[in-house]
A protein has these predicted regions:
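Charged, amphipathic alpha-helical regulatory modules used
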Residues: 8, 30-144
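Short regulatory "switch" loops immediately downstream of catalytic or recognition motifs
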Residues: 1-3, 20, 61-62, 273-277
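Intrinsic-disorder-associated, low-complexity terminal segments enriched in Asp/Asn/His/Tyr and depleted
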Residues: 2, 7-11
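Conserved catalytic cores of very large enzyme subunits
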Residues: 123-127, 133-570
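Intrinsically disordered, low-complexity segments enriched in serine/proline and basic residues
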Residues: 14-21
């Protein structure tokens, strides 16, 4: 009786211990360490941990609400797996362990959990593959210079040897790996990996679009926000040029392609007008002060009276008419108020001086503004400080004196080059050629066309687009810059609109994304058979169409808060 009671007490203690071990996530069999090691996929031999088996089963089961296991069921199933593993010859491998887990789940009628476990295992295999590939990529990016690593040289606009350039590549390469495994359909990812197609800017696949034509006239009116602060409407050509750079930079940070201005001359003309107006009245006050021996305060008061009576809308084009108004107004104003006599001829002389001085000062300010713009677009940072903005400017058709002055000085600044005389890479410049505007001798902007040719011969920019080409002329309406086809930095054009032909305009348009097809490979595979060639081409076109629509669906899900400048200010 004593021996039996002692045995029962010993048995109960052992069961209690086993229960406590199971509650802690362990098993009685694990404590006995009957399996000491496993062989990982890498071939490394590591210590065996039964808790990982239990954890994997638990995580798979939590995905299936209809097959939720109790703790006891989970422990029992883990024990069955361990028992089966003990019967295997030699040290079990990771693959063998996973096969046994699947087998035991199916035998216990946990089919859905088994399927979830298989998916869980597949995900981890992908992660392991991705980790191995990325670690190698990161190692090269971190420790090898660009001359030894192609990845660091694939984008000439990124200095991947710098800290920010390397950081940008970290994000780029990990994003591409993630999209390949979890976002892009497998057959499309494989086609890209094999070189049948090339998905451009794949690192931004689920994030943004390519490029945009920015209407600076619309943007600058009443000011705008970059997403980090609100900017007032510019009132000087220097401010116009500076904010043009900021607009390009802000949009570059929200898109993966280059940014273009389709109406640069029209937009800058407004800044030239404002600068001319300020310089005109400043020069007029200076002339009145000196010529008529007035105090600075009296000259300022008289200038204010002139502005109130005649308005401030004086431009290079209307300066002559304004001079005639001043000639009639000033003698009468002085006489009516009992002030110093100023004759009509003296008033006109004041206006002529103001116009001449304002033109000279505005021209100098415009050159400085364009010089600063060229330097800024080759030095200011975008995208985490790793690039300069990929910028393009379209111009050449604004025949106003102000627009012509802006283009003339941009060409002068481009000819002068950067600080050491080097040719500026940015902005890409496109001169829009149009008969009746600038193409033929006698056209109002013909001199600008000749200047552009001289500049291009020296500095490679501007390039030239021809608005009289049939595929461009069909959209053109005289005097409407929104109907003038403009080009992106990548030389693409977006103008047509098959959905609504009343909206075939330039401003605000852009590209969503690009994918290239490997035509030489198709030609080689066709072996001279045109029927086979077009059959293969049709297959690749269908695949690319599927891919572009897949990417478009992701892009359509984006919100304004994803693009505070592009959509918030557009």
């Amino acid at each position: 009786m004593y021996r039996k009671s002692a045995y029962n007490r010993k048995y109960r203690k052992r069961k209690a211990k086993a229960f406590r071990l199971c509650r802690r996530g362990e098993t009685e069999r694990e404590v006995k360490r009957m399996i000491r090691y496993i062989v990982k996929r890498s071939g490394d031999k590591v210590s065996f941990d039964a808790r990982k088996i239990k954890s994997a089963i638990f995580k798979a089961n939590t995905r299936i609400a209809a097959e939720r296991m109790s703790d006891a069921d989970l422990n029992e199933l883990t024990e069955e797996v361990l028992t089966a593993l003990e019967k295997l010859p030699g040290t079990p491998t990771a693959q063998e362990i996973q096969n046994v887990v699947e087998e035991k789940l199916l035998a216990a009628d946990y089919a859905k959990t088994a399927n979830a476990y298989i998916n869980y295992r597949t995900e981890h295999e992908h992660l392991r593959e991705m980790d191995d590939e990325l670690v190698k990529i990161f190692e090269n990016l971190t420790f090898r210079p660009s001359e030894e690593d192609d990845l660091k040289r694939e984008n000439a606009n990124i200095n991947a040897d710098t800290a920010m350039g390397t950081m940008l590549k970290y994000g780029s390469e990990s994003a591409k790996a993630f999209y390949d495994k979890y976002v892009i359909p497998p057959e499309i990812a494989e086609a890209h990996a094999s070189g049948d197609i090339h998905i451009h800017d794949k690192d931004f696949y689920a994030l943004t679009e390519t490029c945009c034509q920015i209407d600076l006239l619309k943007l600058f009116q009443d000011g705008f926000s970059t997403g980090h602060g609100y900017l007032r409407e510019p009132n000087d050509i220097r401010s116009y040029a500076a904010l043009a750079c900021i607009a390009i930079q802000a949009n570059q940070n929200e898109m993966h392609g280059g940014q273009s201005v389709p109406n640069f001359d029209y937009a800058m003309a407004e800044g030239v007008k404002k600068t001319y107006r300020k310089q005109y009245f400043r020069a007029l006050a200076q002339y009145i002060e000196v010529r008529f021996d007035m105090s600075a305060s009296d000259a300022a008061a008289l200038t204010a009276a002139i502005k109130e009576a005649l308005g401030t809308d004086v431009t290079m084009h209307t300066a002559e008419a304004y001079a005639e108004k001043l000639r009639a107004f000033l003698p009468r104003h002085q006489a009516e108020n009992g002030f110093q006599i100023i004759t009509g001829d003296a008033a006109r002389a004041a206006a002529e001086y103001a116009a001449k001085t304002a033109y000279k000062e505005t021209d100098a300010a415009t050159y400085q503004a364009m010089e600063a713009l060229v330097h800024n677009l080759n030095t200011m940072n975008s995208r985490a400080g790793a690039q300069v903005p990929f910028s393009s400017l379209n111009y050449g058709t604004d025949t106003s004196p102000e627009g012509r002055m802006a283009v003339h000085n941009l060409l002068r600044a481009t000819e002068a080059g950067l600080g050491d005389g080097e040719t500026p890479i940015f902005p890409v410049q496109i001169f829009k050629v149009k008969e009746g505007v600038n193409y033929n001798e006698g056209d109002p902007n013909y001199d600008l066309f000749r200047h552009a040719l001289r500049c291009s011969a020296k500095r490679l920019f501007p390039n030239f687009s021809f608005l009289d080409a049939p595929f461009n002329l069909q959209y053109y309406k005289p005097g409407d810059y929104n109907t003038e086809v403009a080009y992106m930095g990548c030389r693409t054009r977006v103008m047509g609109n098959v959905f609504d032909n009343t909206k075939e305009v330039t401003c605000g348009r852009g590209n969503l994304s690009f994918t290239s097809i490997n035509l030489p490979r198709i030609g080689i595979e066709a072996k001279g058979d045109m029927k086979t060639f077009y059959k293969l081409l049709d297959e690749k076109i269908a695949l690319v169409e599927e891919q572009l629509l897949h990417r478009f669906k992701i892009q359509c899900s984006k919100k304004v808060y994803n693009y505070p400048f592009l959509m918030g200010q557009g």
